[in-house]
Amino acid sequence: MKRMEKDAMIRPTSEAKGYLDHLKKQSVFRRLVDAYAFAAAFAMNQGMDISTVSLKGRYDLTDVGTLDEEVRLALEAGAAVLAKRNGLELTDSSSVIDIVTKYAEAGLPALKERWSGKSGLQIQNDIQKILSDSAQL
């Protein structure tokens, strides 16, 4: 399994960064990178289509090393499984980051729609429901 290098950058779009800031402001997530990782995991779990997600117009958020090790491993494993399922080859760290980024960028709009008009506490409760439902798979 290919790994993401710890010094590689996580690079969301400005639109994604805006929603990440909103989630942090609502105290849903303490760190932007955690919200971005959750969006990626959500999209992976939902089997979202990432074929139209562009990797252009990105801005540095933080390095991969700031992710908790367990989260990093889960994202890498998810990327490996989904790449294999879709006939893609992960050849190096950047290819793993690219697929994780695409899933995060696909997941954020879906979460934004799902959480529209909800308070931070309501969003946190929904996150618990998502995690509980995912654990039953």
Task: Give the predicted meaning of each segment.
Residues 1-11, 15-19, 37, 49-137:
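Charged, low-complexity intrinsically disordered terminal regions and linker tails
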Residues 23:
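Recognition helix of helix-turn-helix/homeodomain-like DNA-binding domains
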Residues 30-40:
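Short amphipathic alpha-helical segments
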